[in-house]
Regions:
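Phospho-regulatory, Ser/Thr- and acidic-rich intrinsically disordered linkers and terminal tails
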Residues: 1-158
Length: 158
């Protein structure tokens, strides 16, 4: 997967994209003046299957849209994030997905990681939330089984 941003991303958005690229072991490019066609061509050039574009509102990551390398929109989620400035210690090759939210099970196909019912280390946990603002929380656990600072709160699935 290739991860990119909207144009002129804030420092927090760039840090979030770098965190995601470290977690999934994928490429991250600053969008700059590239349009969507250029981003899709860049993904093909790097042999990436999917593209994730992170958009921001007032300097904070607010939406992640996933595209296939043919330009088809696969999924869009509205998010709030907390980024990590410390080392994540996640091994992308051994990453697993544990999902308690059926609508987000598709992320295992998008990220090309195995969907498991449970895990103890090196996994992503998608849990359901019952508060008024968020419907799910995506938490990241490192190779030691410890929770990372990186969190994604899903407000809405489009």
């Amino acid at each position: 997967m290739l991860i990119s941003t909207s144009r002129k991303p804030s420092q927090k958005t760039r840090q979030f994209c770098k965190n995601l690229s470290h977690v999934f072991g994928c490429n991250y490019v600053n969008r700059g003046k590239m349009n969507m066609r250029d981003l899709l061509l860049k993904a093909l050039e790097l042999d990436e299957v999917n593209l994730a574009v992170v958009n921001q509102i007032k300097g904070n990551p607010s939406r992640i849209t996933f595209y296939s390398n043919k330009g088809e929109e696969l999924l869009t989620i509205l998010v709030t994030v907390s980024v990590s400035s410390s080392r994540l210690n996640i091994q992308p090759s051994k990453l697993k997905l544990v999902s308690k939210v059926d609508e987000l099970d598709v992320l295992s196909n998008i990220f090309n990681i195995e969907l498991k019912p449970t895990a103890t280390e090196n996994y992503i946990l998608i849990s359901s939330l019952k508060d008024e603002d968020n419907i799910a929380k995506i938490s990241f656990f490192n190779k030691f089984g410890s929770k990372c600072d990186l969190q994604i709160y899903v407000k809405k699935i489009l």
